[in-house]
Amino acid sequence: ASVPADMLEQWFSIISEQLFEPSWREFYVEKEVVQREWAFRYVNNPQGAAWLDLYATAYTAHPYRNPVIGWKSDMERYSTADAKEFHRRFYNPTNAVCVLVGDLTLAQAKQLAETYFERYPAGRRSPEVVTGEPTQQGPRTSVRFLEGARTPVVRIGFHGAPMNTPDFFALDALSMVLSQGRSARLTRNIVDRGLAVEAWAGNPDSRYGGLFVLGGSPNEPDASRQPGLNDAQKRTAYREACEGLEELLLAEIGRLQTELVSAEELARIKKLNRRDLIDRLRSNESVAGTLATLEVQVGWRYLTEYLERMDAVTAENIRNAALTYLKPDKRTSV
Protein backbone atom coordinates (compact mmCIF):
# COMPACT_ATOMS: atom_id res chain seq x y z
CA ALA A 1 0.00 0.00 0.00
CA SER A 2 1.03 3.61 -0.51
CA VAL A 3 -0.08 6.07 2.20
CA PRO A 4 0.89 9.60 3.31
CA ALA A 5 3.49 9.66 6.07
CA ASP A 6 1.06 11.31 8.49
CA MET A 7 -1.43 8.45 7.98
CA LEU A 8 0.98 5.67 8.94
CA GLU A 9 -0.66 4.89 12.28
CA GLN A 10 -4.09 4.68 10.67
CA TRP A 11 -2.63 2.26 8.11
CA PHE A 12 -1.20 0.05 10.88
CA SER A 13 -4.58 0.01 12.62
CA ILE A 14 -6.46 -0.95 9.45
CA ILE A 15 -3.99 -3.50 8.08
CA SER A 16 -3.59 -5.30 11.40
CA GLU A 17 -7.35 -5.82 11.61
CA GLN A 18 -7.53 -6.92 7.98
CA LEU A 19 -4.77 -9.47 8.50
CA PHE A 20 -5.66 -10.85 11.90
CA GLU A 21 -9.42 -10.13 12.29
CA PRO A 22 -10.87 -10.61 8.80
CA SER A 23 -14.58 -10.65 8.06
CA TRP A 24 -15.94 -13.86 6.54
CA ARG A 25 -19.39 -12.56 5.56
CA GLU A 26 -18.67 -12.50 1.82
CA PHE A 27 -16.73 -15.77 1.73
CA TYR A 28 -18.96 -17.69 -0.67
CA VAL A 29 -19.48 -14.69 -2.96
CA GLU A 30 -15.72 -14.19 -3.22
CA LYS A 31 -15.19 -17.93 -3.63
CA GLU A 32 -17.32 -17.91 -6.78
CA VAL A 33 -15.34 -14.97 -8.15
CA VAL A 34 -12.07 -16.78 -7.50
CA GLN A 35 -13.34 -19.94 -9.20
CA ARG A 36 -14.33 -18.01 -12.32
CA GLU A 37 -10.99 -16.21 -12.42
CA TRP A 38 -9.12 -19.50 -11.97
CA ALA A 39 -11.01 -21.10 -14.85
CA PHE A 40 -10.37 -18.08 -17.07
CA ARG A 41 -6.67 -18.06 -16.24
CA TYR A 42 -5.83 -21.78 -16.21
CA VAL A 43 -8.57 -23.76 -17.95
CA ASN A 44 -9.48 -21.62 -20.96
CA ASN A 45 -6.16 -19.83 -21.49
CA PRO A 46 -3.30 -21.62 -23.30
CA GLN A 47 -0.64 -19.65 -21.41
CA GLY A 48 -2.08 -20.44 -17.99
CA ALA A 49 -2.83 -24.05 -18.89
CA ALA A 50 0.77 -24.52 -20.03
CA TRP A 51 2.16 -23.22 -16.73
CA LEU A 52 -0.23 -25.42 -14.75
CA ASP A 53 0.71 -28.54 -16.72
CA LEU A 54 4.44 -27.76 -16.67
CA TYR A 55 4.72 -27.71 -12.88
CA ALA A 56 2.29 -30.59 -12.37
CA THR A 57 4.35 -32.72 -14.76
CA ALA A 58 7.86 -31.66 -13.72
CA TYR A 59 7.26 -32.23 -10.00
CA THR A 60 6.07 -35.51 -8.55
CA ALA A 61 6.59 -34.91 -4.82
CA HIS A 62 7.49 -31.31 -3.98
CA PRO A 63 4.62 -28.85 -3.28
CA TYR A 64 5.73 -26.74 -6.25
CA ARG A 65 3.60 -29.11 -8.34
CA ASN A 66 0.41 -27.61 -6.87
CA PRO A 67 -1.12 -24.22 -7.75
CA VAL A 68 -0.86 -21.77 -4.86
CA ILE A 69 -4.63 -21.55 -4.56
CA GLY A 70 -5.19 -25.26 -5.11
CA TRP A 71 -6.91 -27.32 -7.79
CA LYS A 72 -10.47 -26.97 -9.05
CA SER A 73 -11.74 -29.73 -6.75
CA ASP A 74 -10.07 -28.04 -3.77
CA MET A 75 -11.81 -24.74 -4.46
CA GLU A 76 -15.16 -26.45 -4.89
CA ARG A 77 -14.78 -28.05 -1.46
CA TYR A 78 -13.47 -25.02 0.47
CA SER A 79 -15.79 -23.89 3.25
CA THR A 80 -15.76 -20.99 5.67
CA ALA A 81 -14.55 -23.39 8.35
CA ASP A 82 -11.61 -24.44 6.14
CA ALA A 83 -10.67 -20.82 5.53
CA LYS A 84 -10.86 -19.94 9.22
CA GLU A 85 -8.67 -22.90 10.18
CA PHE A 86 -6.09 -22.06 7.51
CA HIS A 87 -6.06 -18.45 8.70
CA ARG A 88 -5.66 -19.51 12.33
CA ARG A 89 -2.64 -21.69 11.50
CA PHE A 90 -0.72 -19.35 9.24
CA TYR A 91 -1.88 -15.73 9.52
CA ASN A 92 -0.18 -14.57 12.69
CA PRO A 93 2.43 -11.94 13.63
CA THR A 94 5.21 -14.56 13.77
CA ASN A 95 4.74 -15.32 10.08
CA ALA A 96 4.27 -11.69 9.04
CA VAL A 97 6.94 -9.60 7.30
CA CYS A 98 6.36 -5.85 7.37
CA VAL A 99 8.54 -3.58 5.21
CA LEU A 100 8.16 0.20 5.37
CA VAL A 101 9.90 2.53 2.94
CA GLY A 102 9.59 6.30 3.06
CA ASP A 103 9.63 9.32 5.35
CA LEU A 104 9.73 7.59 8.73
CA THR A 105 12.21 6.48 11.39
CA LEU A 106 13.07 3.01 12.61
CA ALA A 107 11.94 3.91 16.13
CA GLN A 108 8.58 5.12 14.83
CA ALA A 109 8.05 2.01 12.71
CA LYS A 110 9.02 -0.34 15.53
CA GLN A 111 6.72 1.39 18.01
CA LEU A 112 3.73 1.20 15.67
CA ALA A 113 4.39 -2.43 14.75
CA GLU A 114 4.59 -3.40 18.42
CA THR A 115 1.43 -1.46 19.26
CA TYR A 116 -0.75 -2.92 16.54
CA PHE A 117 0.76 -6.38 15.98
CA GLU A 118 1.63 -7.46 19.52
CA ARG A 119 -2.00 -7.22 20.61
CA TYR A 120 -2.58 -10.47 18.70
CA PRO A 121 -1.29 -13.95 19.68
CA ALA A 122 2.16 -14.52 18.20
CA GLY A 123 1.26 -17.94 16.81
CA ARG A 124 3.65 -20.53 15.43
CA ARG A 125 6.06 -20.16 12.55
CA SER A 126 5.05 -22.03 9.42
CA PRO A 127 6.92 -25.35 9.15
CA GLU A 128 9.69 -25.71 6.60
CA VAL A 129 9.02 -27.81 3.52
CA VAL A 130 10.73 -31.15 4.11
CA THR A 131 9.59 -33.08 1.04
CA GLY A 132 12.37 -33.07 -1.52
CA GLU A 133 11.83 -33.63 -5.23
CA PRO A 134 13.37 -36.94 -6.39
CA THR A 135 15.96 -36.62 -9.13
CA GLN A 136 14.24 -36.76 -12.50
CA GLN A 137 15.31 -39.89 -14.35
CA GLY A 138 14.19 -39.04 -17.86
CA PRO A 139 12.34 -36.54 -20.07
CA ARG A 140 8.63 -35.96 -19.50
CA THR A 141 6.01 -34.62 -21.87
CA SER A 142 2.46 -33.34 -21.47
CA VAL A 143 0.15 -32.37 -24.33
CA ARG A 144 -3.15 -30.52 -23.92
CA PHE A 145 -5.58 -29.46 -26.65
CA LEU A 146 -7.78 -26.45 -25.87
CA GLU A 147 -10.88 -26.10 -28.03
CA GLY A 148 -10.85 -22.77 -29.85
CA ALA A 149 -7.31 -21.78 -28.86
CA ARG A 150 -5.55 -20.27 -31.87
CA THR A 151 -2.10 -19.64 -30.44
CA PRO A 152 -0.14 -22.77 -29.47
CA VAL A 153 2.19 -22.53 -26.49
CA VAL A 154 5.45 -24.33 -25.75
CA ARG A 155 7.04 -24.62 -22.30
CA ILE A 156 10.25 -26.53 -21.53
CA GLY A 157 11.36 -26.77 -17.90
CA PHE A 158 14.60 -28.04 -16.38
CA HIS A 159 15.06 -28.56 -12.65
CA GLY A 160 17.36 -25.73 -11.60
CA ALA A 161 19.28 -24.40 -8.61
CA PRO A 162 17.93 -22.80 -5.40
CA MET A 163 18.16 -19.05 -4.98
CA ASN A 164 21.34 -17.55 -3.56
CA THR A 165 23.60 -20.35 -4.78
CA PRO A 166 26.41 -19.86 -7.33
CA ASP A 167 24.62 -22.01 -9.91
CA PHE A 168 21.45 -19.95 -9.55
CA PHE A 169 23.29 -16.79 -10.57
CA ALA A 170 24.90 -18.62 -13.49
CA LEU A 171 21.46 -19.79 -14.67
CA ASP A 172 20.15 -16.25 -14.25
CA ALA A 173 22.91 -14.97 -16.51
CA LEU A 174 22.23 -17.79 -18.98
CA SER A 175 18.56 -16.80 -19.22
CA MET A 176 19.61 -13.20 -19.91
CA VAL A 177 21.94 -14.27 -22.71
CA LEU A 178 18.97 -16.00 -24.30
CA SER A 179 16.23 -13.44 -23.86
CA GLN A 180 17.18 -10.12 -22.24
CA GLY A 181 17.14 -7.22 -24.65
CA ARG A 182 16.37 -6.88 -28.35
CA SER A 183 19.68 -8.48 -29.35
CA ALA A 184 19.23 -11.58 -27.17
CA ARG A 185 19.84 -14.91 -28.87
CA LEU A 186 16.28 -16.23 -28.93
CA THR A 187 14.98 -12.96 -30.32
CA ARG A 188 17.75 -12.65 -32.90
CA ASN A 189 17.94 -16.28 -34.01
CA ILE A 190 14.29 -17.32 -33.84
CA VAL A 191 11.80 -14.44 -33.66
CA ASP A 192 13.58 -11.94 -35.92
CA ARG A 193 14.03 -14.67 -38.54
CA GLY A 194 10.28 -15.29 -38.57
CA LEU A 195 10.56 -18.80 -37.14
CA ALA A 196 8.22 -18.16 -34.19
CA VAL A 197 5.89 -15.53 -32.78
CA GLU A 198 7.83 -15.38 -29.51
CA ALA A 199 10.70 -17.16 -27.77
CA TRP A 200 12.13 -16.48 -24.33
CA ALA A 201 13.90 -17.98 -21.31
CA GLY A 202 13.48 -17.41 -17.59
CA ASN A 203 14.99 -18.47 -14.28
CA PRO A 204 12.26 -17.72 -11.71
CA ASP A 205 13.25 -17.10 -8.09
CA SER A 206 12.64 -20.31 -6.14
CA ARG A 207 13.73 -20.93 -2.58
CA TYR A 208 13.91 -24.69 -2.98
CA GLY A 209 15.13 -24.85 -6.57
CA GLY A 210 12.59 -24.24 -9.28
CA LEU A 211 12.47 -24.66 -13.03
CA PHE A 212 14.63 -22.98 -15.62
CA VAL A 213 12.06 -22.38 -18.35
CA LEU A 214 12.19 -21.95 -22.12
CA GLY A 215 8.99 -20.79 -23.73
CA GLY A 216 7.38 -19.43 -26.83
CA SER A 217 4.67 -19.70 -29.44
CA PRO A 218 5.26 -21.06 -32.96
CA ASN A 219 3.83 -19.47 -36.06
CA GLU A 220 0.40 -20.71 -37.05
CA PRO A 221 1.19 -23.73 -39.22
CA ASP A 222 0.30 -23.46 -42.90
CA ALA A 223 -1.12 -26.98 -42.77
CA SER A 224 -3.79 -25.89 -40.25
CA ARG A 225 -5.29 -23.44 -42.78
CA GLN A 226 -5.92 -26.02 -45.48
CA PRO A 227 -9.63 -26.48 -46.24
CA GLY A 228 -11.42 -29.63 -45.21
CA LEU A 229 -9.18 -30.58 -42.26
CA ASN A 230 -10.79 -32.42 -39.38
CA ASP A 231 -9.94 -31.72 -35.73
CA ALA A 232 -7.39 -34.52 -35.51
CA GLN A 233 -5.49 -33.22 -38.54
CA LYS A 234 -5.47 -29.66 -37.17
CA ARG A 235 -4.16 -30.91 -33.84
CA THR A 236 -1.39 -32.80 -35.61
CA ALA A 237 -0.38 -29.64 -37.49
CA TYR A 238 -0.24 -27.57 -34.30
CA ARG A 239 1.66 -30.25 -32.42
CA GLU A 240 4.26 -30.50 -35.19
CA ALA A 241 4.67 -26.71 -35.08
CA CYS A 242 5.26 -26.85 -31.32
CA GLU A 243 7.78 -29.66 -31.72
CA GLY A 244 9.61 -27.61 -34.34
CA LEU A 245 9.90 -24.65 -31.95
CA GLU A 246 11.06 -26.98 -29.19
CA GLU A 247 13.90 -28.14 -31.43
CA LEU A 248 14.93 -24.54 -32.11
CA LEU A 249 14.95 -23.68 -28.40
CA LEU A 250 16.98 -26.76 -27.48
CA ALA A 251 19.46 -26.01 -30.27
CA GLU A 252 20.24 -22.69 -28.56
CA ILE A 253 20.85 -24.56 -25.31
CA GLY A 254 23.19 -26.90 -27.18
CA ARG A 255 25.26 -23.94 -28.35
CA LEU A 256 25.63 -22.69 -24.78
CA GLN A 257 26.81 -26.14 -23.71
CA THR A 258 29.58 -26.25 -26.33
CA GLU A 259 30.56 -22.61 -26.88
CA LEU A 260 31.57 -19.97 -24.36
CA VAL A 261 29.58 -16.75 -24.26
CA SER A 262 31.69 -13.92 -25.67
CA ALA A 263 33.10 -11.21 -23.41
CA GLU A 264 31.00 -8.61 -25.25
CA GLU A 265 27.79 -10.59 -24.77
CA LEU A 266 28.52 -11.13 -21.09
CA ALA A 267 29.22 -7.43 -20.57
CA ARG A 268 25.99 -6.55 -22.38
CA ILE A 269 23.73 -8.67 -20.21
CA LYS A 270 25.39 -7.49 -16.99
CA LYS A 271 24.86 -3.87 -18.02
CA LEU A 272 21.23 -4.53 -18.93
CA ASN A 273 20.67 -6.43 -15.69
CA ARG A 274 22.00 -3.53 -13.61
CA ARG A 275 19.81 -1.05 -15.49
CA ASP A 276 16.69 -3.20 -15.18
CA LEU A 277 17.17 -3.73 -11.45
CA ILE A 278 17.56 -0.01 -10.85
CA ASP A 279 14.45 0.68 -12.95
CA ARG A 280 12.44 -1.83 -10.91
CA LEU A 281 13.41 -0.12 -7.65
CA ARG A 282 12.56 3.47 -8.55
CA SER A 283 9.42 3.66 -6.38
CA ASN A 284 9.09 3.16 -2.64
CA GLU A 285 6.34 0.61 -3.26
CA SER A 286 8.59 -1.48 -5.52
CA VAL A 287 11.42 -1.42 -2.99
CA ALA A 288 9.06 -2.48 -0.19
CA GLY A 289 7.52 -5.29 -2.23
CA THR A 290 10.89 -6.61 -3.35
CA LEU A 291 12.37 -6.59 0.15
CA ALA A 292 9.30 -8.28 1.66
CA THR A 293 9.30 -11.04 -0.94
CA LEU A 294 13.02 -11.67 -0.57
CA GLU A 295 12.80 -11.76 3.22
CA VAL A 296 10.28 -14.58 2.98
CA GLN A 297 12.35 -16.44 0.39
CA VAL A 298 16.02 -16.16 1.36
CA GLY A 299 16.45 -12.96 3.38
CA TRP A 300 16.35 -9.31 2.30
CA ARG A 301 20.14 -8.95 2.12
CA TYR A 302 20.01 -10.95 -1.10
CA LEU A 303 19.09 -7.68 -2.82
CA THR A 304 22.22 -5.90 -1.58
CA GLU A 305 24.43 -8.71 -2.88
CA TYR A 306 22.64 -9.53 -6.14
CA LEU A 307 24.52 -7.28 -8.56
CA GLU A 308 27.89 -8.20 -7.09
CA ARG A 309 27.09 -11.92 -7.38
CA MET A 310 25.88 -11.46 -10.96
CA ASP A 311 28.96 -9.43 -11.93
CA ALA A 312 31.12 -12.33 -10.72
CA VAL A 313 29.52 -14.82 -13.15
CA THR A 314 31.93 -15.94 -15.89
CA ALA A 315 31.41 -17.49 -19.31
CA GLU A 316 32.72 -20.76 -17.89
CA ASN A 317 30.11 -20.60 -15.10
CA ILE A 318 27.36 -20.24 -17.69
CA ARG A 319 28.56 -23.17 -19.77
CA ASN A 320 28.96 -25.37 -16.69
CA ALA A 321 25.44 -24.50 -15.53
CA ALA A 322 24.05 -25.37 -18.96
CA LEU A 323 25.85 -28.71 -18.91
CA THR A 324 24.81 -29.50 -15.33
CA TYR A 325 21.14 -28.48 -15.32
CA LEU A 326 19.87 -28.28 -18.90
CA LYS A 327 20.14 -31.98 -19.65
CA PRO A 328 17.61 -34.18 -21.46
CA ASP A 329 16.93 -36.34 -18.42
CA LYS A 330 15.90 -33.22 -16.44
CA ARG A 331 13.62 -31.85 -19.16
CA THR A 332 9.85 -31.52 -19.05
CA SER A 333 8.07 -30.39 -22.22
CA VAL A 334 4.52 -29.07 -22.42
Task: Please provide the spans of the model-predicted regions.
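Short beta-strand/turn micro-motifs at beta-sheet edges
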Residues: 84-88, 141-145, 198-204
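Short, conserved secondary-structure transition motifs
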Residues: 35-41, 132-145, 271-280
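Extracytoplasmic/secreted cell-surface and envelope-processing proteins
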Residues: 106-110, 166, 223-225
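Surface-exposed patches in mature extracellular/periplasmic domains of secreted proteins
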Residues: 23-30, 47, 123-126, 259-266, ...
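Active-site-adjacent, His/Asp/Glu-enriched structural segments that form or flank metal-binding
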Residues: 1-48, 77-80, 84-95, 115, ...
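Active/ligand-binding-proximal structured segments within catalytic/core domains
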Residues: 156, 166-178, 186-190
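An aromatic/glycine/proline-enriched structural segment found at the starts
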Residues: 26, 60, 68, 93, ...
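M16 family metallopeptidases and their MPP-like homologs
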Residues: 1-17, 46-73, 95-101, 150-162, ...
